[in-house]
Amino acid sequence: MKRIISSVSFLCGFALVAAVAHSSSHEFFKGKSIRLLVGNSAGGAMDDWARFVAQYLGKHIPGNPDIVVQNMPGAGGITAANYLFNIAKPDGLSFGIVNPALYSDQLIGSKEVRFDWPKFVWIGSPEKIDQVLFIRTDFPSKTLDEMRNAAEPPRCAATARAGLAYFLPKLLEEALGIKINMVLGYGGGGEMNLAMEKGEIHCRAGTVSAYVGREPTRTWIKKGFVRALVQSGAKRYPKLPDVPTFYEVMEANKTPEATKRLARVLLSSGDLGRPIIGPPATPADRVQILRDAFTKAMSDPALLADAQKRRWDLDLSSGAELEATAKEIMVQPPEVIERMKKLLLEK
């Protein structure tokens, strides 16, 4: 009988401790502010999505904390990622939306990297970010085939070497032999759009959803200022049915299998989307609260109505899905990494 009483007492005590811990974790966020860093400058799609999510996320977190968005551009997003990994307190109050292709910097051994990609805490992503490469219509070459023999290569913008905006044009060079002059150092999509308007650049890659659904590109399309050349997804985006995928282009040009594998590694960053990540060692209970809140926020009728009004498409990834992808993508054979180094490091 004593053993039974002891067992019951233990279970009751365990349940009480668990209940207190649960209550404590839910009370933690009350009266506090969560800082959401953006690894890009203001005015681009990454910044817009961060501010969009921030409007709705807080009310689905117990305690209804404020969500404060702060831009931290630099080194193509590495600055923000390094900060989150090494400096931000792992207390559940600091997170960020960062460039999903930063894993490529780690794979090729970039000296600037001070993080281990799979060890971040992963909360979720509101959309996948397959890209479309678009160019000003006043550029003389009208097609990819014509660009092969262009008298002057087009100038194409990107924030840095780690990112689909850089990967897609460079993969065209690798697969088709098209020469493209990359212009790096832009803080985000807003700066690149302004440079395109001024004629500083001819082309850039951006997300397919932003290209058809956001300004200024939505108006540019209507006015015939730009045209789409190729998109990065495995399938054609429904709103760009006449624009070939890069995979279709590779098949049509009988691209070698080694180049196809390189393309798959680089373009898969689109599956990570616009990941919300946090510092390693963030308490698991707080991570789960934030993951649950993200899922609830993404189904909030007010958010869905706002997204529809903006003509934005949601394509969610859970924190668990992002975590699995992040771990998988870091396991690459030496020959792929060497090809990546050649593509991303050689000028």
Which role does the model predict for each range below?
Residues 72-80, 183-198, 209-213, 320:
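Short helix-initiation/N-cap motifs at beta->coil->alpha
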Residues 30-32, 222-223, 248-252, 261, ...:
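An extracytoplasmic/periplasmic, membrane-proximal ligand-sensing/linker region
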Residues 34, 59-61, 83-94, 102-200, ...:
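Hinge/capping helix and adjacent helix->loop/strand transition within the periplasmic-binding protein
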Residues 8-18:
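Bacterial N-terminal signal peptides
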Residues 100-112, 166, 170-175, 198, ...:
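A ligand-binding cleft/hinge motif common to bilobed small-molecule-binding domains
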Residues 35-50, 73-76, 157-164:
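Extracytoplasmic "Venus flytrap"
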Residues 66-74, 157-159, 180-188, 206-207, ...:
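Short beta-strand-to-loop elements that line the ligand-binding cleft
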Residues 118-126, 179-185, 216-269, 318, ...:
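Short beta-strand->loop
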